[in-house]
Amino acid sequence: MPAPKQKARRFRAGPGAAPHRRPEGGARRQAQAQARARGAARPAPVVGTPFLIGHLADVLHMVLKLDGPADVLLSVYFKRNHELGSRDRGTLAETVYFALRHLASLSWAMAPAAPARAPRLAALVAVAWKYGRGELSEAAVGRDKEAIEAILAKPLERMPAAAKAEVPDWLYEKITAQYEDAEGFFRAIAEGAPLDIRVNSLKATVSEAMKELDAAGVAAVQMRYSPDGLRLKEKVGLGALPVYREGRIEIQDEGSQLIARLLAPKRREMVCDFCAGAGGKTLAIGAMMRSTGSLYAFDINAKRLEGMVPRLRRSGLDNVRRIAIRDEHDKRLGRLAAKFDRVLVDAPCSGTGTLRRNPDLRWRLSPEELSRINAVQASVLRSAAKLLKEGGRLVYATCSVLKEENQDVVEAFLAEHPEFVLKNAASVLEAQGVAFSEAEKVQFGDWFAMLPQRQDTDGFFAAVLEKTGKKPQPRG
């Protein structure tokens, strides 16, 4: 376990092993309490100390098993280790996400390190790469000095192409086959994602929210595309701010905000968010409906729907009905056939469009899992389409950048359902004041396809379908 913090000596020579025990804690907590009582500010931690390297190695040992989402595993670890201050937690989280974004490089550089040593070596190398070799203290490096020097001396330009791209081989092949600017995509997902927020138009205007954020010392700029969106210049905690607690803003990526606008719901309509999850798009749709009509939020995960409750309370929406269903074939859905004016199918997907903010996902995904998801997508779309009335609009959306989850699914559906027609997505958004360049319109075609390397959003796909009710006559 991690050793107590100690004053750092820079990495020059490393006599002795770095201690790796849980800190005793009593004297340390007493000193912290005395410092707080004196009003003394706690100095920023030196990253490469035995204390933080020990914790970082422990976290990486847990996270790199890839048994679950990194953010969930980090939260569990922090709850178990109360000796970590807020700055420590922030530093550890940043470094863990850095390691996950550069896991292929780390694995290549450390090979053939013994598995038992891998988390500790990965912790040391990640700190050296992210913060500079000088951040490693001698005590933290200890007897690993020779191994670390050898790893840091490896010529990374000799890595295989997929390792340079920081993705598995199979995903590298798919992305490079589909996109001419695949290298731009790989560079984009190597960086962190910005913090985007949507202004709740039921409670504030964009300018009012900007002023309130500015008064709280939070700098924001208006988004390039979303009329309701702001992008924060720096990532900050919003949870304590009244503008967030009172529901005037919600965290939501710009691309996700535009998905709701593609649905373009109107007041007093009957609308369905078929795979609502925690409700980010549900909230945006409800605000566009001005909390009128009926907005059904379906999901197979009752716990996720329950997580929507505090968000709904903050938002001021009272037109949302949350319904947990068994699956897309739930018998209760049959009673709602052809009842809805608008249906959003935010389909389960690989999440490859979110790799900037979920870097572990690329290592937890497999071709077999992708095939399973693909079958579910087609089934969900067919079931959701039955809910739409004639003349209604259906939006099929994913946060994937892979054609087989997007265009291929929709084209197969249209071939089976000639009563549906594809609408031009850019035109739908332009009618609402969202401007795209001519190059972007060419990029989209009839689809909506935002990409991190082109629009600086998460990767999102959507298709806008309308139900005409008129089946074409067979050709004679």
Model-inferred region functions:
Residues P2-A240, K339:
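Class I Rossmann-like S-adenosyl-L-methionine
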